Amino acid sequence: MLQPKKTKHRKTFRLYHDKRDAHSGNFVAFGDYGLQATGSAWVSAAQIEAARIAITRRMGREGQVIIRVFPHLALTSKPIGVRMGSGKGSVDRWVAVVKRNTILFEVRGVKDEIARDALRLGGHKLPLKWKIVATV
């Protein structure tokens, strides 16, 4: 799964859910079709990987999938049954902070109906609302 190779600090502050629009990464740049977030959420590395697998399996051997988000934020958690205190918990998972209108995945090199169907299948694996956009 996706996670940074090296970070300056092992544990980070927990960011708030930013409900504003994304000002970068909000248009299809590399492919023909894209999966655009219409809401904001934290998307975990496992969810990104599940969506990628669903998209690539639908596309078969043709075409290319571009992942436009990366999980940079480390979320920590304490084990079940441990009392409060005694420091911050260990890193549990990595998440990508996704703002509204961010392009999550792009597809190129396949037919229109296959690309839309593949992105639809991948979008169902994600915890946010989305829409399929195309370059004109």
UniProtKB/Swiss-Prot annotation:
Biological process, per Gene Ontology: translation
Superkingdom to which the source organism belongs: Bacteria
CDD domains named among the record's database cross-references: Ribosomal_L16_L10e
GO cellular component, one term: cytosolic large ribosomal subunit
Annotated Gene3D superfamilies: Ribosomal protein L10e/L16
GO MF, any single term: structural constituent of ribosome
Alphabetically ordered keywords of this record: Ribonucleoprotein, Ribosomal protein, RNA-binding, rRNA-binding, tRNA-binding
Role of this protein: Binds 23S rRNA and is also seen to make contacts with the A and possibly P site tRNAs.
PANTHER family in the cross-refs: 50S/60S RIBOSOMAL PROTEIN L16, LARGE RIBOSOMAL SUBUNIT PROTEIN UL16M
NCBIfam families named among the record's database cross-references: rplP_bact
HAMAP family: Ribosomal_uL16
Family label: Belongs to the universal ribosomal protein uL16 family.
Quaternary structure and interacting proteins, as annotated: Part of the 50S ribosomal subunit.
Protein name: Large ribosomal subunit protein uL16
Protein source organism: Mesomycoplasma hyopneumoniae (strain 7448) (Mycoplasma hyopneumoniae)
